[in-house]
Amino acid sequence: MQFNIQDIIKMLPHSYPFLLLDKVTACVPNESATAIKNVTFNEPFFIGHFPNNPVMPGVLIVEAMAQACLVCVMSDSKCNFENYTIYFMSIELAKFRKPVIPGDILTIEVNVIHKRKDTCRFQCFARVDQALASEAQILAMIKKN
């Protein structure tokens, strides 16, 4: 499955300036997803991080990973964000290996590595030009509203 920005807007509860995915290039519901974030100099966070050396904050890279995890789960035809809420319970083993700067295309890959009835653990990677920029494990709980 692939999703354009209009699909993502319908699937996620986020909106500008906190919607951090531009498209999903591959998705197997409840298994994996690959998403793209086009990093531009117009991002509001670059105003202060850092004015003379713009770098995407690591916490926003992790947030982009979390949004890709949400797409992975919400792309299941039985789910939608109006009926379910996903709570992120933990971020573990986060590592930031390469700065992400304006002009970069951030490719985010998420894989479900463990799933129980109402929780999922994801292994997440963010790459720029195939070089690993960051990685983390995210644990999420899925609750019906």
From Swiss-Prot:
Active site feature: 49
UniProt function note: Involved in unsaturated fatty acids biosynthesis. Catalyzes the dehydration of short chain beta-hydroxyacyl-ACPs and long chain saturated and unsaturated beta-hydroxyacyl-ACPs.
Gene3D superfamilies registered for this protein in UniProt: Hotdog Thioesterase
Family matches, as SUPFAM superfamilies: Thioesterase/thiol ester dehydrase-isomerase (SSF54637)
InterPro entries: FabA_FabZ, FabZ, HotDog_dom_sf
Protein name: 3-hydroxyacyl-[acyl-carrier-protein] dehydratase FabZ
Reactions catalysed according to its record: a (3R)-hydroxyacyl-[ACP] = a (2E)-enoyl-[ACP] + H2O
Annotated source species: Ehrlichia ruminantium (strain Welgevonden)
HAMAP family in UniProt: FabZ (MF_00406)
Gene Ontology cellular-component annotations: cytoplasm; membrane
Main location: cytoplasm
A UniProt-annotated Pfam family: FabA
Subcellular location: Cytoplasm
Biological process according to GO: fatty acid biosynthetic process; lipid A biosynthetic process
Encoding gene per record: fabZ
Family: Belongs to the thioester dehydratase family. FabZ subfamily.
Molecular functions (GO terms): (3R)-hydroxyacyl-[acyl-carrier-protein] dehydratase activity
Keywords: Cytoplasm, Lipid A biosynthesis, Lipid biosynthesis, Lipid metabolism, Lyase
